[in-house]
Amino acid sequence: MDPLTHFDEKGGARMVDVSLKGDTRREAVARGRVLMHRDTFRRVRDGQIAKGDVLAVARLAGIMAAKRTSDLIPLCHPLSLTGVDLHFTLDELHSTVEIESRVKTTGKTGVEMEALTAVSVAALTIYDMCKAMDKNMVVSDIRLVEKTGGKSGHYIREE
């Protein structure tokens, strides 16, 4: 296992110095899900939630969150993202909204945290917009599924 890079020699937190690293194309994909009651799921699917189009708002929230990741996660570098996309899959059998984010940049450090943040905030937005009718929703399985670029190369999660 690689040493933890966010700590100095005395164990104090630090932001890693990436100034000597070269720019490379980087991409990360993350996924998560929101499980809900069947009636809630149908209302999300059919656009019948009082607060508005749940998936459209969640998509925008996820994109905005990816752009603000360094404001939320203390040791993340502020990045110039070149692309953020969120995709939703409606799983009617399990009353679940599956969320996938894809984040891209060309830079000195990866975009894994931005992809994970996008999924997390999109999921929380779905919860927020539907909580009046379903407080039993479950946000789960937020995970990195793929990353490319940088020193560690290409990673694909085995699912």
Swiss-Prot record:
Annotated CDD domains: MoaC_PE (cd01420)
Q: Would you tell me the protein name for this molecule?
A: Cyclic pyranopterin monophosphate synthase
Gene Ontology biological process terms, A to Z = Mo-molybdopterin cofactor biosynthetic process
Family, as annotated? Belongs to the MoaC family.
User: Residues that bind substrate, according to the entry?
Assistant: L75, C76, H77, M113, E114
Species name = Heliobacterium modesticaldum (strain ATCC 51547 / Ice1)
Among NCBIfam families, the record links this protein to: moaC (TIGR00581), PRK09364.1 (NF006870)
Question: Keyword annotations for this protein?
Answer: Lyase, Molybdenum cofactor biosynthesis
